[in-house]
Regions:
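Glycine-rich phosphate-binding loop and adjoining beta1-alpha1-beta2 segment
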Residues: 152-188, 203
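Long, charge-rich, low-complexity alpha-helical segments
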Residues: 31-158, 164-166
Length: 661
C-alpha cells in the first residue's frame, strides 16, 4: 500500500530506548520490545532519532538524505511507526508551550503522548487550569507541592480549620518549584463549610483532602463543584486507610462520592462517618506522616492529571482507591450507585406494566450479572465463597450481603446449596438478591407502594409498612414464576397461625410409597444412607395449598409450601438433608433457619389408608390465592425494586401481601 509521505509527521516516543545487539538493534518502550535486524540498523536509528521530533514530514526527512537511502529511511520509519515506537503527529493540534517548558515537563508530556494525541496542547491546557485545593493539614501542603511539580501554573489553596496548616511550608515548596518554572504562583481562597460554592467558584477542578472523616463536606462538595462547572476528586482518611476518588467530571454524577461512601458503610457500619456527619474531633492516623502524606497526595494529583489531560476521558466515576497507610498497599474498589444517594424517584405504577413482558433472567444469567455486585469493601455483596464448608452430600456456597440502609443490623451471610457447586452458587446469588431487596427500602418513595393484583394484573396501592422490611421475598426467572413463588412464600408465613388454631393431628406421610421428583428421590436415598430419621406431616388442609412439616429427633427442621406438591416435598427433603450436614459437620452457619416446633399433639401417624404415600393435590395460582383470601381481600405482588441497579439485574424480586379494602 502506497504511503503519502507528506501525511506522516513522525515523532519518536519519549520512552523509547535503543540498544546495539549482534543482530542489529533492540528497541524497547512501555509498549514492549522488538528486535530489528540489520548491520547498520542501530546507527540509522541513532542518526535519525534527533530528527524524529514531529516538526518534519516523512517526505521532508527523506529529502534530506541521498536518494539512494530514501527508500530505506522511509521503510525504517514506517516500521517503527507500525510497532508503535514512532507516532504520526500530523493531526496534533497546535500549542503555544515554550521550548523551555516542554523540556522541563518532558516526562509529563511523554506520559500524555503514550495515551492520546496533542500532548503539548493537553499539557498546556492542564497547566492553565484553575485547580482549587481544599482541605487542611500536611495533606493539603503535600497536595500543593504535588500540583506544583505536576506543572499547574497557579494552584488555588482553600484551607479549612480542622487541622493546622503551614503556609510557610507551602512557600518553601513554591520556591523550589520556581527554580525550574519561574511562572508558578500560589493563590489562597478563604472558605468555610457553610459556603462550599465559594470553594468551587471559577474552578476547573476541585481537589479535596481530609485527614479525618469530614464526611458531610465530602458528600456536598461534588455538587458544589458540578454547579460551578468543575470536576472534583477527593481523599478522605478514615482510621488507617485513605479513600481516594472517585474522579467526577464537570458533567458527571455528583452523587458518586456519596454512593461510594454509603456502599462502604453498608459493609462496615461501625466506620466513623457512617452517620454522614463531619467528625473533626477524630485524631488523624498515626501512620499519616512523613513520606506517606506525599504518597497519598500524589495519588490524588495523578488522578487529576489524568482527568484534566483527557487520558481518562470516557471513564466513569465508579471506583475508589483504598490506600493502606500502614502497609502502603493500594487496591481499586468498584461500587454501584446507592439508591439513597440518587435523587428521589416517586413510586410509579407505570413501571409495573413492563414486568409481564420483560426478558426472562435464568439462574446462569443472574449469576453472570451478579459479578458487578461483588467487591470486598464497596460491593452490594462482599464475596461469593464456599469457605471451608463441608461439600457432601450437598454443595454449599455463601454470599456476604451488605446492609444498604441499616435495617438488617449489619452485613449478613446468605447461603445456597445444591447438587453441584455451580448450582449452589447460583442459588446463593438468587437468595442473596432476594434478601438484599427485602431490606433495601427507600423511604422517600412514600407511605404507599404499588403492586399488581396477582390474578387480574390490576395496579393496587398498598401500605409500605406491609411490604418493608420484607419478612419473605421471592423471585423467579420471569414474572409469572416470581408471582407463584411469592404466593407460596406468603402461604408459608401463615403456618404458625395455622398451628395455633389446629385441633386435629396432621397426617403423617408414608415416604416409601410417596411420588417424588427425581431430585426428591435422590435426597430420600441420601437420607437413608446417612441414617437420618425424619417424619413428614401434611399441613395442606388448613393452608389450602401443599404444605409439609419436616421433623427429626432433633426438632422441627422446616415448613415448606408450594403450589406443586412434589416440589414442596423435594424442597423439604433438601432442607432436612442440609440440616443433617450442618449438624454432622458442626457448621451451624448454613443450617436452615429455626422454626417453631410442630407440637407433639399435632403429629399424626401413618394409617393403613395412608400407606400409599399419596400426596395432596397440587393447586393452581387461582386456588392458592383463594386459600390466602378466605377472609376476604386480594393478593398483591409488590416488586422489591427500590435499588434501580437490582431492578435491572434481577427484575423479578417480589413480595406478595394480602390487602383488605
Amino acid at each position: 500500500m502506497e504511503v503519502d509521505v507528506e501525511r506522516v509527521r513522525p515523532r519518536l516516543r519519549g520512552d523509547v530506548y535503543v540498544m546495539r545487539v549482534q543482530e542489529g538493534a533492540y528497541i524497547r518502550s512501555n509498549l514492549g520490545g522488538a528486535m530489528l535486524k540489520g548491520a547498520s540498523t542501530y546507527e540509522w536509528i541513532q542518526r535519525i532519532a534527533p530528527m524524529l521530533d514531529g516538526t518534519r514530514t516523512l517526505g521532508e526527512l527523506c529529502a534530506a538524505v541521498p536518494e539512494s537511502s530514501r527508500a530505506a529511511l522511509a521503510k525504517l520509519i514506517l516500521l517503527l511507526q507500525g510497532k508503535g515506537y514512532v507516532k504520526n503527529v500530523l493531526d496534533d493540534r497546535p500549542h503555544t508551550l515554550t521550548a523551555d517548558l516542554a523540556t522541563t515537563y518532558a516526562a509529563n508530556i511523554a506520559f500524555i503522548e503514550y495515551f492520546t494525541d496533542s500532548p503539548e496542547l493537553r499539557f498546556e491546557l492542564y497547566r492553565g487550569s484553575t485547580v482549587v485545593l481544599a482541605g487542611s493539614g500536611p495533606l493539603l501542603q503535600a497536595l500543593a507541592n504535588s500540583q506544583l511539580r505536576a506543572g499547574v501554573r497557579t494552584p488555588v489553596l482553600a484551607p479549612f480549620a480542622e487541622s493546622p496548616f503551614d503556609r510557610d511550608r507551602v512557600a518553601e515548596h513554591l520556591a523550589v518549584a520556581q527554580a525550574q518554572d519561574p511562572e508558578q504562583r500560589i493563590a489562597y481562597r478563604d472558605v468555610e463549610d457553610r459556603h462550599l460554592d465559594r470553594v468551587a467558584a471559577d474552578a476547573t477542578m476541585v481537589l479535596h483532602v481530609a485527614d479525618r472523616p469530614m464526611i458531610e463536606r465530602a458528600r456536598l462538595l461534588p455538587a458544589a463543584a458540578g454547579a460551578a462547572g468543575a470536576a472534583s476528586a477527593q481523599v478522605v482518611v478514615v482510621g488507617d486507610q485513605a479513600w481516594i476518588g472517585p474522579v467526577i467530571g464537570k458533567d458527571g454524577d455528583a452523587t458518586a462520592w456519596e454512593s461510594a461512601w454509603r456502599r462502604l458503610c453498608a459493609l462496615a457500619p461501625d466506620y466513623v462517618g457512617a452517620d454522614l456527619r463531619d467528625h473533626p474531633e477524630v485524631a488523624p492516623s498515626e501512620f499519616l506522616r512523613g513520606p506517606t502524606v506525599a504518597l497519598v497526595a500524589n495519588h490524588l494529583c495523578f488522578a487529576a492529571f489524568r482527568h484534566l489531560t483527557g487520558i481518562d476521558e470516557g471513564t466513569g466515576a465508579d471506583h475508589l482507591v483504598r490506600f493502606d497507610l500502614e502497609t502502603l498497599e493500594t487496591a481499586n474498589h468498584a461500587f454501584l450507585p446507592h439508591p439513597l444517594a440518587l435523587p428521589a424517584v416517586p413510586d410509579d405504577p407505570a413501571r409495573l406494566a413492563a414486568l409481564a413482558a420483560a426478558v426472562p433472567v435464568d439462574d446462569e444469567e443472574l449469576a453472570r450479572r451478579a459479578v458487578d455486585c461483588v467487591d470486598p469493601r464497596t460491593g452490594v455483596f462482599a464475596e461469593i465463597t464456599e469457605r471451608d464448608y463441608e461439600q457432601l452430600p450437598l454443595f454449599v456456597s455463601e454470599v456476604m450481603v451488605s446492609d444498604p440502609v441499616g435495617l438488617a443490623g449489619g452485613p449478613f451471610p446468605v447461603h445456597g446449596w445444591g447438587e453441584s457447586v455451580v448450582e449452589s452458587r447460583q442459588r446463593a446469588v438468587r437468595n442473596a438478591l432476594e434478601r438484599y431487596a427485602a431490606v433495601m427500602v427507600d423511604p422517600r418513595k412514600g407511605d404507599r407502594l404499588h403492586g399488581l393484583d396477582v390474578l387480574t394484573g390490576e395496579p393496587v396501592a398498598v401500605d409500605a409498612a406491609a411490604v418493608f422490611p420484607a419478612r419473605t421475598a421471592a423471585s423467579g426467572s420471569d414474572w409469572p414464576e416470581a408471582m407463584r413463588a411469592a404466593v407460596a412464600a406468603a402461604a408459608g408465613e401463615m403456618v404458625v397461625a395455622a398451628l395455633s388454631t389446629a385441633t386435629e393431628p396432621f397426617r403423617r406421610l408414608a415416604m416409601d410409597g410417596a411420588e417424588l421428583t427425581p431430585r426428591g428421590a435422590r435426597y430420600l436415598k441420601l437420607l437413608e444412607i446417612v441414617e437420618q430419621p425424619f417424619e413428614v406431616h401434611d399441613l395442606s388442609g388448613p393452608l389450602g395449598l401443599p404444605t409439609f412439616a419436616f421433623t427429626t429427633p432433633k426438632g422441627t427442621v422446616a415448613y415448606v409450601s408450594d403450589l406443586d406438591a412434589g416440589v414442596a416435598l423435594e424442597k423439604g427433603l433438601e432442607r432436612t438433608l442440609l440440616a443433617y450436614q450442618s449438624r454432622a459437620a458442626n457448621q451451624p452457619a448454613y443450617a436452615p433457619p429455626s422454626v417453631p416446633g410442630l407440637p407433639a399433639n399435632l403429629r399424626g401417624e401413618i394409617t393403613e389408608t395412608d400407606g400409599t404415600g399419596a400426596l395432596p393435590d397440587s393447586v393452581s395460582l387461582e386456588e392458592a390465592v383463594a386459600a390466602l383470601t378466605r377472609e376476604g381481600g386480594r393478593v398483591v405482588a409488590v416488586p422489591l425494586d427500590h435499588d434501580p441497579f437490582l431492578a435491572r439485574t434481577c427484575p423479578f424480586v417480589v413480595r406478595a401481601v394480602v390487602v383488605h379494602g
